[in-house]
Curated annotation (Swiss-Prot):
The keyword Secreted does not apply. The keyword Hydrolase applies. Belongs to the peptidase S54 family. This is RHOMBOID-like protein 2. GO terms for biological process: proteolysis. It comes from Arabidopsis thaliana (Mouse-ear cress). It is found in: Golgi apparatus membrane. The active site is at S177, H229. It is an enzyme of class 3 (hydrolase).
Length: 317
């Protein structure tokens, strides 16, 4: 909660910027968003590199197996029966850094906890995540700058990977969903910790909770890593209380009126800040220790597997 922002690069448009949900002071700073577009470009570049390495026509042989979109040459997709998302094979993803519990724990490849968030199972998976990132991330970066948003994105992605590794140990996992849910969690905690500056509190809260609920519900479908979503969301939720705190509404005006001096931050903002820092440090530390000790989260929580896939008459998990 420093008095001055360290993010000077890309700072623009100091002045009022109308927002339906909250009231802004005339001196509030807005940044040009460049990090989120750069992350999108990086993810696209990584996907192209993965498809180049995959080289489906060279590896797929036999009359009953055919690469999808063969006109793309070595960039063509695996057969739909193998990958319905129009992407590479599981072996290629594993080779390129997918999250795989045994390799992380027994082969000491902890870097996979971060590398997996730059990989995607297919073009549908990639486009869905990147469109969501643009929709969510650009607004946050414009309001809070690239340093804070970048930290939330990376640390939330790590948190999602850790929780996924603790509960899903028989499959590989890829995607930026954990980081995306971290941004959603940060948006929710930002709303709560900056509650006094919001003009349309109920509308903002209901809209955000609806988006979060729908996405978490979709995570209960088969082949979706909802543990990465939950881990990323919880990490981002705590980080929002730490990194996205705004001064109280009217604090700037009170600085020139000594008879009505107002504290820059409320007491509840300080409390949420401290509690969130403690939860983050303790939670990530305990989770990492459990992971590298080879613990299986399902043994400690018998019902938790329903959070990632809920069986119905239409599908099995």
């Amino acid at each position: 909660m420093a008095n001055r922002d360290v993010e000077r690069v890309g700072k623009k448009n100091r002045g009022a910027n109308n927002n339906y949900f909250y009231e802004e002071s005339s001196g509030e700073t807005h940044w040009t968003s460049w990090l989120i577009p750069a992350i999108v470009v990086a993810n696209l570049a990584v996907f192209i590199a993965v498809m180049f390495v995959n080289d489906c026509p060279k590896k797929i042989t036999g009359p009953n197996k055919e690469c999808v979109a063969r006109f793309l040459g070595r960039f063509s997709f695996q057969p739909l029966k193998e990958n319905p998302l129009f992407g590479p094979s599981s072996s290629t993803l594993e080779k390129m850094g997918a999250l795989e519990w045994r390799k992380v724990v027994h082969e000491h490849q902890g870097w996979r906890l971060l590398s997996c968030m730059w990989l995607h199972a297919g073009i549908i998976h990639l486009l869905t995540n990147m469109l969501s990132l643009i929709f969510i991330g650009i607004r946050l970066e414009q309001q809070f700058g690239f340093i804070r948003v970048g930290l939330i994105y990376l640390i939330s992605g790590l948190g999602g990977s850790i929780l996924s590794s603790l509960f899903l140990q028989e499959s590989i996992s890829v995607g930026a969903s954990g980081a995306l849910f971290g941004l959603l969690g940060a948006m929710l905690s930002e709303l709560l910790t900056n509650w006094t500056i919001y003009a349309n509190k109920a509308a903002a809260l209901i809209t955000l909770l609806f988006i979060i609920a729908i996405n978490l519900a979709l995570g209960m479908l088969p082949r979706v890593d909802n543990f990465a979503h939950i881990g990323g969301f919880l990490t981002g939720f705590c980080l929002g209380f730490v990194l996205l705190v705004r001064p109280q509404y009217g604090w700037e005006a009170s600085r020139t009126n000594t008879s009505r001096t107002k504290r820059k931050y409320s007491m509840y903002q300080y409390v949420l800040f401290v509690v969130s820092v403690v939860l983050l440090v303790v939670g990530l530390t305990v989770a990492l220790v459990m992971l590298f000790k080879g613990e299986n989260g399902n043994k400690h929580c018998k019902w938790c597997h329903y959070l990632s896939c809920f069986p119905t008459s239409k599908w099995t998990c």
